[in-house]
């Protein structure tokens, strides 16, 4: 053998030995296996680990309950686990088994994560920590972990070890009872968000409850009260309804042109429902409807709001899983118990895109409300509302409202803003002339697209849901019975429509 080759082989063998000795090196400090074995008084590696998964939106609740249960033992300990990233990739059982041969998991400080518990509040929750305490007189060890999709862990979990399997089962039964007893989500306004790794990894966002009065919502007389009575008033008489065997769950569909006040009406409902849990879904978060319905059932009385629900009928590939999202919504609305105090509030700009099963089936949607374009009196009220604190004269407000027929609430808000902007550019106080100049500007022929973006199409239309003028495509529609009303005609190809009369194709 060549002398250089022999030396290379010897050097390489020494390198392998050094690498292997590094793997077998014992980490300094008290080891995980030793600690749990001493606490349970039996070899920890011989015990079965019981895993309890916790949804991402309930992790703060789980942290609160774990702290309560551990604190009942005045001698409890909370410790962390060292060992670098390996601890994130291995289960508690794996760590204990590996520690028999390669003790690489010394005790350290717990890992924490800051999580919201309200619009302006946060809690420091245990992200990775080992609870050592006695429950009902028996020692228990619980490893608490938050969800970490980047390490392959999609949900938070508790990994429970006890000397006797019954002790572990009793502890988890008590943990579940306390989780069902209450939640930091109850009575809050929250929206479900999509996580980077899919719906199951998403959490919740807390929102401050809106502060609105009936005078802040300008709708035709009696319309707002009708919606509020159905969404909120029924719950006030739940005992009477239950006594007569009538269901509490209800569905409300708010439909109409964009910008007419559907979302503002929802905000009013939220403002008048203090103490009621509200779950908001829109856009991508509509894929979490099943989860939202389960939360609403657990946290009732509650309201589930689905914004722009026509999207789920328009795009059947929207949902995650084998079922189209539309059918998930139907199942969620129809799957609740009759005594569940849950209100579903759906909004849509395109009622013709919703299938008959969603719009007409009793128990799913039992109140459909057309939120129309504001008439003259409503337009006066809208300009007055958005001009609070601005010295417009009543005559100027009426003139502006009269000249903006066929426009929406969003248009009225933009009209007042334009008047203020013009005054700022002129360097003068806001006056009637600025308001009327803003009317001239927004109603000019060159601002057709701007008016359309504010939900205000050409004036005119029929009794039903307003269509959009201009060339378009036919609406899909369904045969009667349905929602009648010719809408606003356009030169496009007419569609079969939703109901006996139908809609013109949207522009």
Where are these regions (language model features)?
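Aromatic/hydrophobic pocket-lining residues that form π-stacking "cages" and hydrophobic walls in ligand
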Residues: 66, 175, 266-269, 292, ...
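Residue-level signal for secondary-structure boundary elements
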Residues: 74, 78, 183-187, 239, ...
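Short, glycine/charged-rich beta-strand-loop motifs at protein surfaces that mediate ligand recognition
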Residues: 161-162, 370-371, 401-405
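Walker A/P-loop NTP-binding motif of AAA+ ATPase domains
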Residues: 214-395, 469, 474, 479, ...
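C-terminal alpha-helical "lid" subdomain
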Residues: 361, 376-507
């Amino acid at each position: 053998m060549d002398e250089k080759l022999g030396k290379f082989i010897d050097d390489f063998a020494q390198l392998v030995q050094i690498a292997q000795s590094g793997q077998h090196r014992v980490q300094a400090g008290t080891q995980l296996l030793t600690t749990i074995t001493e606490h349970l008084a039996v070899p920890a590696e011989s015990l079965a680990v019981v895993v309890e998964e916790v949804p991402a939106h309930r992790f703060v609740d789980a942290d609160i309950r774990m702290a309560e249960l551990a604190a009942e033992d005045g001698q409890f300990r909370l410790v962390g686990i060292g060992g670098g990233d390996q601890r994130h990739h291995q289960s508690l059982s794996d760590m204990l088994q590996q520690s028999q041969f390669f003790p690489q998991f010394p005790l350290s400080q717990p890992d924490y994560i800051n999580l919201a518990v309200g619009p302006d509040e946060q809690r420091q929750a245990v992200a990775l920590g080992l609870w050592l305490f006695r429950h009902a007189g028996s020692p228990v060890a619980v490893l608490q972990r938050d969800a970490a999709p980047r390490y392959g862990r999609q949900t938070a979990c508790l990994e429970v070890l006890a000397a006797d399997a019954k002790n572990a089962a009793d502890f988890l039964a008590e943990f579940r009872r306390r989780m069902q007893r209450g939640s930091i989500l109850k009575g809050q306004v929250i929206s479900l968000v999509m996580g980077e790794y899919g719906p199951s990894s998403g959490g919740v966002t807390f929102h401050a409850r809106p502060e609105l009065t009936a005078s802040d919502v300008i709708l035709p007389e009696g319309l707002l009260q009708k919606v509020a009575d159905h969404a909120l008033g029924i719950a006030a008489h739940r005992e009477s309804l239950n006594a007569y065997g009538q269901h509490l769950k209800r569905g409300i569909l708010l439909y109409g042109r964009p910008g007419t006040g559907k979302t503002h009406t929802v905000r009013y409902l939220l403002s008048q429902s203090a103490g009621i849990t509200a779950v908001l879904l829109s856009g991508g978060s509509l894929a979490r409807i099943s989860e939202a319905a389960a939360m609403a059932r657990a946290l009732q009385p509650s309201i589930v709001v689905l914004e722009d629900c026509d999207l789920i009928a328009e795009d059947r590939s929207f949902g995650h899983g084998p079922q189209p999202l539309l059918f998930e919504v139907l199942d969620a609305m129809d799957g609740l118990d009759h005594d569940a105090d849950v209100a579903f509030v759906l909004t849509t700009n395109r009622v013709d895109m919703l299938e008959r099963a969603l719009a007409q089936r009793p128990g799913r949607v039992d109140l459909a409300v057309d939120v129309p374009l504001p008439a003259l009196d409503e337009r006066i009220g809208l300009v007055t509302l958005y001009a609070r604190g601005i010295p417009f004269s009543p005559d100027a407000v009426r003139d502006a409202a009269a000249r903006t027929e066929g426009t929406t609430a969003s248009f009225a808000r933009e009209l007042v803003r334009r008047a203020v902007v013009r005054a700022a550019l002129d360097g003068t106080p806001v006056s009637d002339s600025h308001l009327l100049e803003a009317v001239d500007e927004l109603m000019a022929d060159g601002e057709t697209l701007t008016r359309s973006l504010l939900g205000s199409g050409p004036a005119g239309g029929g009794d039903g849901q307003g269509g959009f003028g201009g060339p378009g495509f036919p609406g899909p529609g369904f045969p009667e019975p349905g929602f009648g009303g010719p809408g606003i005609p356009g030169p496009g190809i007419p569609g079969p429509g939703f109901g006996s009369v139908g809609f013109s194709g949207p522009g």
